[in-house]
Amino acid sequence: ENIKACVFDAYGTLFDVNSAASKCKEKLGSKWEGFANAWRTTQLEYTWLRSLMKKHKNFWEITEDSLDHTMETFKIKKEMRNELLDLYKKLSPYPEVKKCLEGLKAKKIKIAILSNGTPELLKMLVESNNIQNYFDDIFSIESVGIYKPDSRVYEMPIKKYDCKPENICFMSSNT
């Protein structure tokens, strides 16, 4: 009753960050899962380090940098880079996502994404999965220039929906 909006993180919450590597299982071989996990871990570490150093780089550049590092660590052929990056732009949603969004829409609750991703990347993700019509807003950290968990990031939906933090249900797979 007090919830005005449900705000989802995108990567790892709505979209399976391992799905790009999963689609390349045959080429990556048995190390695909370790590779996928290392890529994501490196990506998150790079965002935290950049925030601490106050040297912002957009999420796509960090995704590329973390992929390059992980490919080198796992000795993956350079030819796979573009394929993995193209697949990352179209990550698969988790199976329960559409049903969850439909349920929230039926309750007339505002639905939004709050993500480290760039506006362009997030738009591509929701459109490639045909779920763009479920979202009232997509908030990107690019408008504040610092990564989560900085409090300024979470103020965006609070200001937009003119409410208190306790009126927003924020859902994320990252803690």
Where do the protein language model's features map onto the residues?
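Substrate-recognition "cap/lid" segment bordering the active-site pocket of phosphatases
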Residues: 118-169
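Active-site neighborhood of HAD-like aspartate-dependent phosphohydrolases
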Residues: 1-44, 73
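Short helix-capping segments at alpha-helix termini
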Residues: 28-32, 73-79, 106, 130-134, ...
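An amphipathic alpha-helix signature
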Residues: 21-22, 36, 40, 60-68, ...
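A metal-dependent, Asp-based hydrolase signature
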Residues: 33, 47-83
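Acidic di-acidic motifs
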Residues: 172-173
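Substrate-recognition element of Asp-dependent hydrolases with the DxDx(T/V) motif
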Residues: 78-92, 97-127, 137-141
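Glycine-rich phosphate-binding loop signature in dinucleotide/nucleotide-binding domains
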Residues: 1, 106-109, 161-167
